[in-house]
Amino acid sequence: MFFTCGSNEAMVVSGFCRSPPVMVAGGRVFVLPCIQQIQRISLNTLTLNVKSEKVYTRHGVPISVTGIAQVKIQGQNKEMLAAACQMFLGKTEAEIAHIALETLEGHQRAIMAHMTVEEIYKDRQKFSEQVFKVASSDLVNMGISVVSYTLKDIHDDQDYLHSLGKARTAQVQKDARIGEAEAKRDAGIREAKAKQEKVSAQYLSEIEMAKAQRDYELKKAAYDIEVNTRRAQADLAYQLQVAKTKQQIEEQRVQVQVVERAQQVAVQEQEIARREKELEARVRKPAEAERYKLERLAEAEKSQLIMQAEAEAESVRMRGEAEAFAIGARARAEAEQMAKKAEAFQLYQEAAQLDMLLEKLPQVAEEISGPLTSANKITLASSGSGTMGAAKVTGEVLDILTRLPESVERLTGVSISQVNHKPLRTA
């Protein structure tokens, strides 16, 4: 089951599966009943009234001191909370406060023993800081933090503090009398200084008045010079303005003449334009009409030539297409002829080979005898036996031709004589 606690309280869960124990400050925790245990510890701030009665100071004077301290168990620091749980778990707030009070009182007594009454009485802040510092370093090991410490009261049974007050009162009265005498002395000195400063101020005032008079006269002379200069400049400016006005009048007159002359020129230009228009109407218009007519004729001739050229181009294109079609038809016919020859060769294998050889033999013979037809002169050499002359040439040619079937057989592997004597076979 779940257990919750506020921010001023911490829970410690121990038992099964809780080693080390779980500490939760201001939250909730799940606890297994019967096998786990939950304990709570207060995190409230405790106010302690720390009294130290008749403690002997450094000079052996017994005094009593009362201080107010605010302490609490620190729940945000896990280590301090663990230390506080080890020392105070299961104890009440009163018991925790009593332990902290005893610790603080011991440190307060120790600090009082190391200081004089005057130091404690006059410098309470120093005493409070020392107690706070020493006590905090000790209580932090218990998990307790000192929030604040203030010295509330100091008293004694020997009238030591009262005697200190009397001595202080006498010192104050003495200081007051000395201060009064010094004040009277300072007043006389200040009065004399005031008189001296008054005379000095009077002299300085007269000097300043003389300087002011001098500056006035100098400035007045400068102003007079400036006024006369400005007056002369004004007179000169007037004369210059009169001259400028006359010059402007003359310029206006010249401008009027220029305008009149410009108007005359404009009238002349209008007359010239009118005459040019008359000339254009009488001469230029007919010439332009003739030129326009010639341009139209040239354009018509140009269009006719372009149309003729386009017609010729179209004729050439159609002739080319017809020739291309004829070439294609001829190529198709040749291809068809070749295909039929291939079919015939496949059908009549040896006969077809013989036919091809016989068809090409005249061409071979023509190529062999070709060089003889182009020869201009034949020179024969003989060893003295056999025929001579033309019969010799004819015999050589016939001998070449008779050996032609053997050459064909060596090149193609087909014997013309054997093919000729064999009966035809189909595939």
Swiss-Prot record:
Biological process according to GO: positive regulation of cell junction assembly; positive regulation of cell-cell adhesion mediated by cadherin; positive regulation of endocytosis; protein kinase C signaling; protein localization to plasma membrane; regulation of receptor internalization
Membrane-protein topology: Peripheral membrane protein
InterPro entries: Band_7 (IPR001107), Band_7/SPFH_dom_sf (IPR036013), Flotillin_fam (IPR027705)
Keyword Phosphoprotein: yes
Compartments, record wording: Cell membrane; Endosome; Membrane, Caveola; Melanosome
Modified residues (Phosphothreonine): T387
Quaternary assembly: Heterooligomeric complex of flotillin-1 and flotillin-2 and caveolin-1 and caveolin-2. Interacts with ECPAS.
Family in the record: Belongs to the band 7/mec-2 family. Flotillin subfamily.
Official protein name in the record: Flotillin-1
Species lineage: Eukaryota, Metazoa, Chordata, Craniata, Vertebrata
Gene designation: FLOT1
